[in-house]
Amino acid sequence: MGKPTLLEPGHLYNVPAEHKNDVPIHYIITWIKQRLPEFGGAIPTSLADRVLIIKSRTGSGKSTALPVHVFRILRNENTHSFQKYLGRSVICTQPRVLTAVTLAKDIGASTHYPDMILGQTVGYQTKPLTEKPNRGLIYATAGVLLAQLHTMTDDEIASRYAFMIIDEAHERALGIDLMLMYIKSMLERMLQRGSIGALRIPFVILTSATIDTHKYSTYFGIGKENIILVEGRQYGVETHWPLYNTNNYIKTACETALTIHKENIHDRPTEADILIFMPGMAEIRFLSMLLNNANMDLAKEKLPLMLILPIDSEAIAQENEAYLGLKAEIKNLWVKNPLTAKVEKPLRRVIVSTVVAETGLTIETLKYVIDPGWNRSIETYYPEWAGGLITRPAAQSRIEQRKGRVGRVFPGHFYPLYTKHVFEQIPAQQYPEIITEGPGAIFLSIVVETIKKNKEGVFKAEEIDMLDPPPTDALASAIERAIVAGLLTRGEKGLQLTQLGDIASRFSFLSIEEARMCFSGYFWQAAISDIATILAVVSVADKKLTNLLDSKQRNGAMLAEAVLAGIPPFLQNIDNAYTNIHLLLADDLLEGLFIFEGFQHAIVYFINNKVNNVAKHLREWCEKKMLKYSSMVQILARREDILNELAIVGLNPFHHWQNRLASANAETFLKRVCTLKQCMYEAYRLNCFCYDEHRLLYTGRNGIHFSYHDAVIKNPSCIVTPRIMLSPVSKQYMEWRLEPSFVSVLDGFVNVDINFLLPRQEIPNILGGVEDEEEEPPLPIQVFLHKYVKTHFHFSGKSFKELKMKPGQTIKFPETTLINMIPDIPKNVVQTYLEISVCHQYSFKRLIYCETFYTDMDDVQHENSVELIGLPMAAHHLTINDFNKLYHLLKPDGFLMVYDLHQSQEAFWLHSLQDALGHHTIRRDMDFHTIPEWETIFKECGFTPIFSKQPSEHELFIVFKK
């Protein structure tokens, strides 16, 4: 392989004239050393002293030679390999697992870098795969560095890394944009600390073949002297533009590959491979089938055969046969003749790949690239919050990356399946994901990072410091979701994180809804392992539960055997088991839970029986159940990640393990189903939809509507879904329809606030402040209540009743009288919600939850809400005067506790109390029976008792104020 242009003189641009003929890597290393104090440079005082942008064409060695030579700044290349390196590391991020792993292995095996030994001085770290030294050059996916920046302090990062190289920095994934935001903020904070922080501040290098240097230099506030341009490949690439566009790019790609193969039958196998880009796995499978059929024709003509290798992220993660064929030398590969069934040497490999092969991958035998010009990515539309995989023309920058796969070792050929005129019309750069998808799971991270820079400690949208801020409608939707989830609230000065929001912001990758569902699980005493499993199923199965099936013809009936493998024992012998389970659960997510439980049972069975090669037996088990083994493994990994996330922030990931749905009996099963559905409802409340009998459609508060049909459950009145998906109506036209991803029926399981689902009004100024208005006198108490309040009576665990309550009406329960509460509701109240759950025999901890919704912004917000946590019995003795006093005492902040002494081992409020009291430890076996004893504990932590009541020796009610 020839030298990369970084190692050849005369390929520099945008540098002083006297240096244009320098060896680029020498110039770059000298430029860096001049800014390092240990080499005589000055102490850095600005970002210009620590940020360098290198725009280097494909094939220049920016992913290989550059990181190695940067590492050699820290460790001389002549250092003996047996001498362990103990200094700081160099991390080089890659957008994909394939490139991170491949680059590390290639450098470790290269004779050009004898000092770089895999596992000692060079390695890789990705989420599923790791082989890295404790110190050295580490290739990692962007997500690895992002998680470290999210959880570690500035000093911890600085003590670990001397250099951070962000390769393929032009990619605008959400994680990469957030990572750059973190890096910039970290550099600024360390510079503000003066020489103490600046001495060890990491050096940041951004590299790409197609980076927008003006945009990135403006973002980091650096000048042209911080931008170095390097010429790329040493060999030419001929572009073969077609005269006409194609109407069937898959068929045309096959025909083009076959033409190339036949017209270049004398290619040497070491200079013959073809790479074809496809937007998705479905297209890859179809094209692979066509190419295999073409091999049949080649065999009939007695021509050399092609070896077809379909490659996507799943193939890489599993390191399957196709991936191993990609990494092997062509001389060691064989292909079966479809006529004779004998194996023979292929002339060339035809690699059919998604965008995983677009960047950072060097295939030394690659000579031809065929590009249909399409790219598929997730797009989300607001305020409907509906999204899906949309196929659009790839940007020019992506096409240049694809073209750059050839011409690295010898001259190459590029075959676009679109005309040159079309190429000139498409956008130059790809749209960032924060524009096409919205902030999504990184929203709370954006909020926290923005709040850090705000002196008032509030979130202001105009202060978001990103390459591209989120669109206004996407940001408004994210704020709404965070407020409804109880993670964000509007204080006197602006939007602030709640206590739950502060905890949620510490999660590395959980979305707003996922975090809320976990919190609800703790609140309702659900098994958190079940919550984690459900969230993992949603993440992996994506649109529908049938995506877990390993079959081309997928339908719900095929799930039956997989679902039944994980149901509780008492349900396994009923007639028409799957139909009855489907009818009983009325929930795709719970069926997904049982599918995973069956997979888990299989794992335990094989391990307990000490079978050899557990993975092989699990694959066979999945085949019998018609499940994708890879998907089940992904669910297992995702579930473990969620449980680890909870543990990292200090939450018990095995909370109420005994309440798992799979271990339920006949008496507890429905209660646990209700509990899990309640958690889903609270997490995805904005995605509740009611059935409109007149339109025969499901409608929601955002005005969107869709049809939903189930073969067993006919038109349930209320459903909830994790997301609304865009599904193509046809392959020929750019038309989509809305449909729910997974459906959980709420009828009879959850008390749904119907008024909340009414179409919302368009109210301006969500992102700004509230205009000053004259204070209005309070309205009568009666405006507080809805038209009616749904109230569940649960006496025996078998029967439910629902009462309709008029404004001002007194509700009478056995041993209980609760009347209108909390006066002085402001004029701008548009909705209130009062839910009263009275449970005998079952210790539900949620008693009263009052949410007040205001109209001083565009979206719903909780403010001055009161939550009583504890058993209902403790509140039976509270009068209207007690509640009135409570309301005034709690404003603007306070802590409310309802506690039943018999339930101390399971009281949920201990979690909230632990957080409220900071470092003060609360033992779960505490048994304080009197108010003075509790007052002593709270006083030690700075709380003052302001209201207390002890109706009996077993009941306690105290309010404390900070």
UniProtKB/Swiss-Prot annotation:
Localization, UniProt: Host membrane; Virion
UniProt cross-references to SUPFAM superfamilies, sorted A to Z: P-loop containing nucleoside triphosphate hydrolases, S-adenosyl-L-methionine-dependent methyltransferases
Pfam family, one: DEAD
Membrane-spanning ranges: 521-541
Molecular-function GO term, any one: RNA binding
Membrane topology, from the record: Single-pass membrane protein
Keywords: ATP-binding, Helicase, Host membrane, Hydrolase, Late protein, Membrane, Nucleotide-binding, Transmembrane, Transmembrane helix, Virion
Residues of the Helicase C-terminal domain: 253-459
Motif (DEAH box): 167-170
Domain Helicase ATP-binding residues, every copy: 43-229
GO cellular component: host cell membrane; membrane; virion component
Family: Belongs to the DEAD box helicase family. DEAH subfamily.
Official protein name in the record: Putative RNA Helicase B962L
Species annotation: African swine fever virus (isolate Warthog/Namibia/Wart80/1980) (ASFV)
